[in-house]
């Protein structure tokens, strides 16, 4: 079933009356399915969720605050600004915390690498033991026998051989 963005089944008289042909194509489905799909597409509408709709009223808090006098704003900014030493302390504390976190991650990855190496070493050891056991038991294993089905020819094969001998 091929569908377009909107529309209805094309190639039908009903669809040509309601919508332009070619917007929605239903191939390989029954007439009833096509009609139900057409009703769905004509009735479906995509409204935004209620959370995403903005409601603007006169007393709305969504509006921006009114600008104040620039002199008052400058005095407020100068009195509220922290000392530059506080910013440096914050940067130092942040850098230390970041270094500690990086060292913990590095230790975690080194531990994972060590575990991986141990697992690979164990697998190599088990493989070598398995190969050595197979080599020890190799002389005592029965050898593969040729299947009898290859040695015995079918009746048609025997007839063919007899006919060839008769021709000679």
Curated annotation (Swiss-Prot):
Keyword Isomerase applies: no
Keywords linked to the UniProt accession: Cell projection, Cilium biogenesis/degradation, Cytoplasm
A GO biological process held by the record: cilium assembly
Signal peptide bounds: none
Subcellular location: Cytoplasm; Cell projection, Cilium
Disruption-associated phenotype: Male mice exhibit severe defects in spermatogenesis, leading to infertility and varying degrees of hydrocephalus. The epididymal ependymal cilia frequently show disorganized axonemes, reducing motility. Mutant testis shown lack of fully developed flagella in the lumen of the seminiferous tubules; the mutant spermatids elongate but do not maintain the axoneme, leading to severe destruction of the flagella. In contrast, the ultrastructures of motile cilia in the tracheal epithelia are intact.
Tissues and organs where the protein is expressed, per its UniProt entry: Specifically expressed in tissues with motile cilia and flagella, such as brain ependyma, lung, testis, and oviduct but not in whole brain, liver,kidney, spleen, and eyeball.
GO cellular component, one term: cilium
Annotated spans, Disordered: 142-168
Coiled coil: none
Chief location of this protein within or outside the cell: cytoplasm
Function as written in the Swiss-Prot or TrEMBL entry: Required for motile ciliogenesis and flagellar genesis by mediating the maturation of the glycolytic enzyme ENO4.
Family: Belongs to the HOATZ family.
Extra information: Named Hoatz according to the Hydrocephalus and Oligo-Astheno-Terato-Zoospermia phenotype of Hoatz knockout mice.
The protein's name: Cilia- and flagella-associated protein HOATZ
Source organism: Mus musculus
